């Protein structure tokens, strides 16, 4: 069959090529090389755990296609610049803030799964590991820090589509409940969990992590990976985790915070942090010290804290992967492709605006790491005190 097709169509292709001008042939070859090169680059850089979601099938998650433009307009208007130059949400009510986080994840979930990984976090990579392995190691560390053991009831605070929760449940034998505000992420989490055969070990629950539908003292341990930064106030989510944990239980967190090197009087520092806030749906950027004070304020005992991004000098930095995406042109090409698909109606109208919002912050994330002014993985290991006898 293949030989027959070749015999039939090859002469026609050659004949058609002979009728083309040299510049047309050169343009065609160049286009083929560029497109083929891009496909190879993004295949190499994307996680081997990527999903089947296509660039041309990115959606607004739980937002209907014709409503994406309206929600994007609301997202843009949600931010304002303070007198000190810092970008923050101007919402007065917690309800509005929660709504905007939900909107952000409606818009970004498909893109994260397609272009990043099914674990929505950064990680530092050992030289012998690939990206997916580094992600798993990052998740294993927090399970160890939270003292998770077989049979425990554990809560994953801000679970996304659930991959860290599934990883930790698989490796520890614990039963993990993952909480996310976003209904579309619940749908995706259930899809992945069923596919992994872990429905009896990991359960996603749609809820606001500042107001969870669980009884007091009902969990043996808790962890959060780059998620609590989305809370309107850190005290609100930390207090709720404190409530649902049993006395003596541990809560381990990777918190996204600015570091001591951040200078609020440095214009470039402020621009970078503002970009991270806007491109990641964060109410505002907390400092490492503010996160520490928030946990202590609600009653937790702090065992220790450190920046996991600086813990070892032999690991590739957490910004290695985004730096590769920028340097290879994947970010620029993807934004361009999404813009074209937006214009011709393949993607929801104004989805390109959102892609630009997220894509523009990636070079700034790299610079924030290189300057040492931000980390997505400041470790805090908290413990709820035992009840006094």
Curated annotation (Swiss-Prot):
Protein name per the record: Sterol methyltransferase-like 1
Gene Ontology cellular-component annotations: endoplasmic reticulum; membrane
BP GO terms, sorted: methylation; steroid biosynthetic process
Organism: Botryococcus braunii (Green alga)
The enzyme's E.C. designation: 2.1.1.-
Localization annotation: Microsome membrane
Pfam families reported for this sequence: Methyltransf_11 (PF08241), Sterol_MT_C (PF08498)
Keyword Methyltransferase: yes
PROSITE patterns cross-referenced by the UniProt entry: SAM_MT_ERG6_SMT (PS51685)
PANTHER family for the chain: 24-METHYLENESTEROL C-METHYLTRANSFERASE 2, PTHR44742
Gene this protein is translated from: SMT-1
